[in-house]
Amino acid sequence: VADKPVDHLRPRNARFIGPLSRMDPARAIMPDKNYRIVCVISGPEPQRSILERELMRLLPAIPGEHLIVRGMPGPVPDERRGHVRSIGHLADDALTGALLGADLIVGRTGYSTVMDLERIGRTALLVPTPGQPEQEYLGRLHKDNGRFIVQVQGELDIAAALESRVAGTRIPTTRDSGERQLDVAMKELAGLLPGRCSGT
């Protein structure tokens, strides 16, 4: 069922290992000056560019320094329009620092984005990529549970998102990263294998 959780499909011997994320708050590189709004754009064209243009239309009217991470591979020159800076990409630790210091984060509703936000304990304004069923599903799910602010591309109201009580909240982080929990699970699994020899 499209709008129902899939807990009933989970095998009895399965375990959740938490979010698998490239981000680690302990390694975050904080920017010299925090940005008020940090937007991380992703997704296929032309939807990526459509969202970028919408953000560039809206952000100049909002006070503060803002950053758009355009999610474009290869060398992309930095651009600045007034108090809005656009860059092609950021290294993981620098991106983590920028997100941690922001008053508002804007991104897609992709699984990796949701897991990254869970890992660093931040909520965000999420914008599902039109035509991608999994992102539209996650958008409905998180809009209903109130964990994130969810708006439709083409109808963004960033000022309202900034004023929302959700925007500045922190969400509980997992005690361990998904990688560490996965490592523990794999070691336990290895111990259950028949004929396992020590030292192999």
Q: Where are the predicted features?
A:
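A short, active-site helix/loop in glycosyltransferases that binds the activated sugar's phosphate group
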Residues: 1-12
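Donor-nucleotide binding loops and adjacent catalytic segments primarily
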Residues: 18-104
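A short helix->loop->beta-strand "cap" motif at the edges of active sites that frequently abuts
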Residues: 12, 64, 122
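A donor-sugar binding/catalytic signature common to diverse glycosyltransferases
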Residues: 95-137
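Short acidic active-site motifs
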Residues: 93-94, 113, 157, 181
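C-terminal amphipathic helix plus adjacent low-complexity
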Residues: 159-200
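Nucleotide-sugar donor-binding patch of glycosyltransferase catalytic domains
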Residues: 86-89, 123-168
